Amino acid sequence: MNILKQVDIETEVRLALTEFFEAYNRPLPEEYGLPNVLIEQTGGSSRDQIDTFQVRLSVRAETDEEASDVMRNVLGVLQARAEEQFGALRHVSLNSLANWSTDPVRPDLKLCTALVLITAHRQAVTIPES
């Protein structure tokens, strides 16, 4: 049977960013470098061959300025990767961006969070009959 399945958007985004940033999917490792970006899918919808995902990006850094600067770079890289049609990524748009001041888990770190919508193509796969 031929089907269209959703891509693992967290992995797609991590792969798009890994060349330029230290990027993780949940859970964060106990030991991690700074600055880094955590990628979490928070929702989404499907229509025909296209999926639209809601993704939260969280940048941890030593200062507010660094966290904000890295986040803007992360968003720029994702938009460029979507234009290149990297993997399944097709379009990235920013919903909101906020500096939360400190990371709730590690108060010594600064945190900048963005909510983005990412459009991606579904994958065509064949499921063998059993």
Predicted regions, residues:
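Charged, amphipathic alpha-helical segments and their flanking helix caps
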Residues: 1-22, 40-130
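Short acidic low-complexity segments
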Residues: 24-31
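A short, hydrophobic beta-strand-centered structural micro-motif
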Residues: 32-41
